[in-house]
Amino acid sequence: MANIVVKRLERTPIDETPVEIVERKGIGHPDSICDGVAESVSVALCKMYKEKMGVVLHHNTDQVELVGGYAYPELGGGCMVSPIYILLSGRATMEVLDKESGKIIKLPVNTTAVNAARDYLKKALRNMDLEKDVVVDCRIGQGSVDLVEVFDRKRSEIPHANDTSFGVGHAPLSTTEKIVLETEKLLNSDALKAEIPAVGEDIKVMGLREGKKITLTIAMAAVDKYVNSCADYVKVKELAKAKVEENAKKYLDGHELEVCINTADDDEDCIFLTVTGTSAEMGDDGSVGRGNRANGLITPFRPMSMEATSGKNPINHIGKIYNILSNIIAEDVAKIEGVRECQIRILSQIGKPITEPKILDIEMIPENGFELEDLSPKAKEIAQKWLDNITEVTERIVSGNVTTF
């Protein structure tokens, strides 16, 4: 049995606090572009390693950097002047010794990484010309010998932690968190893009709740080739605002909602107009891990890990596995009848099996009429079950079925 501790969460339930702030950086934000590219490269390497070697080999591709380009957007359609530059860096296993033949097997790491990055950009940024608007440069190197040894040790058994680190998670999402998350998903959905193609992918949603009032301040790039006049631009904002307000009704739960889009505009001389749908074309830079946490949100009123989740190897990198696992456990514990809120923290020790954390801390707020002592055994059972089946988390990640940002 793992060292699992359950205790009462000594705080006011989040929805009853006077103030809450929640943020999400959309998929076209420069930081999120880096997160998405890094994770796509990792997933592609996992699949390549399994195809070539039968197992996922050591890699960490969480060092993607984006250097903003330069564009000249204008009503009716502008142009890129200098391309966006994306650097893929990190470490990966590029050569493997075949013990039977004694030969060195070289693995197509750089080709796999560049192709994965470009495929992701094509999917995420529909108005970007991959041949002209972006340069993808791969400088991924060979992994550290010591860390590779930890990664490979007893491969047929449970992986060992690559570091002494921790992961955190919480559930359920608050009303504000749900609205912020679902608003960005709506604005970047295929359905909305088909209806309002001028809406770009660079969207940031900042949610503020004061009592029972929620204010969404949304930065939303517009794509210039779909906007022929300032009146068109204003209409795009109005249509998007109406869609956001309608969608939010499903989650408001009695809250008042105010939606503000592109508040820096004067709708004549200063508007958020882009060629590609992202501010990365206008000198805005990006890095992995500088935006959304593993649950897709930035939540300063909740515990958060500063670890970047995207791009880390899904076998034994605690910064990835324990952050994702913490959220999964929190979601399952929150489904127990009588649990109002749940927070999870999991701490590893380097070199120890990832199924044996130094501690797995569960904090809960019981609903009225329920006692912590009655809820504790069920919560521990859920946590232990996930530790015993931790490789399922890895399988979900490798298959691309887990969101890391």
Swiss-Prot record:
GO biological process: one-carbon metabolic process; S-adenosylmethionine biosynthetic process
Protein family per UniProt: Belongs to the AdoMet synthase 2 family.
Enzyme class: transferase
Superkingdom as given in the UniProt entry: Archaea
Keywords per UniProt: ATP-binding, Magnesium, Nucleotide-binding, One-carbon metabolism, Transferase
InterPro entries: AdoMet_synthase_2_family (IPR027790), AdoMet_synthase_3 (IPR042544), S-AdoMet_synthetase_arc (IPR002795)
Cofactor(s) the protein requires to work: Mg(2+)
Endoplasmic reticulum recorded as keyword: no
Catalytic activity: L-methionine + ATP + H2O = S-adenosyl-L-methionine + phosphate + diphosphate
GO molecular function annotations of the record: ATP binding; magnesium ion binding; methionine adenosyltransferase activity
A Pfam family it matches: AdoMet_Synthase
Name listed for the protein in its UniProt record: S-adenosylmethionine synthase
Positions of ATP binding: 141-146
E.C. code: 2.5.1.6
Keyword Magnesium part of the UniProt annotation: yes
UniProt pathway annotation: Amino-acid biosynthesis; S-adenosyl-L-methionine biosynthesis; S-adenosyl-L-methionine from L-methionine: step 1/1
Organism: Methanococcus maripaludis (strain C7 / ATCC BAA-1331)
Task of the protein: Catalyzes the formation of S-adenosylmethionine from methionine and ATP.
